[in-house]
Amino acid sequence: MTFALYLSPRKAFATLALAGACVGVCTGAAWAQSPAGEPAALHQVELPLPSGIVLRAHWWPAPRPSSAQANASVQPAVLALHGCGGLYAKAGVLSSRYRETAETLHAAGYAVLMPDSFGSRGLRDVCQTRYSDRSLNVNDRVQDARAALVWLAAQPGVDARHIGVMGWSNGGTTTLNLLVQRLIHPREGEPTLAGAAVFYPGCGPLLKHQAVAESVPLLMQLGALDDWTPAQPCVDWACTLKARAGSDVTVHVYEDSYHGFDGTAPVRLRGDVPNGTSAHGVHQGGNPTARVQSLASLQSFWKRVLGTPTAP
């Protein structure tokens, strides 16, 4: 088991690579055509849930391989989970973060599924609602994700052995809790996961309860200055995962970076968010250096755990 700390020349990020020990650091029906401004390959689908909720999702099937590569009939896929602000910008189209992610993954040959947990329940966002007052909790979103994974694995053209899941903020928290719940309450027919990647999740409850997660390759990308979902609980929780044989956890902590460091908007104080470490609000916004580094790390991670898809 190895532990390594890496700093870029400008100290843009620190990498906590935990290969097993921490040393000194603790099939729905299409319901609409692609909206204007969305990627051309986009389909919108509906996934009926056992609860009676119909989960809407955005679906980008992987590009078809050329005729010369027709034997490569299945491609890897990624399930992507939105944050507390929901999937959409004010104009009603996918926000730039999710649109960019979908386009990048799709161009690389991956299928992409993005469930809309909020819109499916008549919600736009929950960022301004205290955790204790939210009508939709993380466990609800975990159930959404589990149903979405089953649907995704059943789609023609998807390699059910190579499915990854990722999430940002509340979606990252959901991703981590998904790994915990799949270990505690396994379900017959669920696909295995090839890997999971999260941006700035909330890890406090996981650390408090010393939760144990499904052992899959895990990439955690955190902001050192995050006062909304602080990095340290995630670093500490990642260290507890070392106790499991064969653990594969990598944590990147980006210096001078707040919540949303992978975005392009400038950092601002959000006094409307009551869930941070300060009563005065939280900071949110991008860090150009951390953005480049984190997106490159994400791309490398997917190549490692999902493989390189057959080019269309």
Task: List the model feature ranges, each with a label.
Residues F3-A17:
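Bacterial N-terminal signal peptides that target proteins for export
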Residues A14-C26:
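Bacterial N-terminal signal peptides
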Residues Q33-S73:
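N-terminal cap/lid segment of alpha/beta-hydrolase-fold proteins
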Residues L55, P65-A153, A265-P266, G271-Q284:
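Serine-hydrolase catalytic machinery in alpha/beta-hydrolase-like enzymes
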Residues A89, L136-E214:
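Primarily recognizes the serine-hydrolase "nucleophile elbow" in alpha/beta-hydrolase
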Residues M220-L222:
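Short beta-strand/loop motif that positions the catalytic acidic residue
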Residues D227-V235:
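Conserved alpha/beta-hydrolase "acid-adjacent" motif
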Residues G246-P312:
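C-terminal catalytic histidine-bearing segment of alpha/beta-hydrolase fold enzymes
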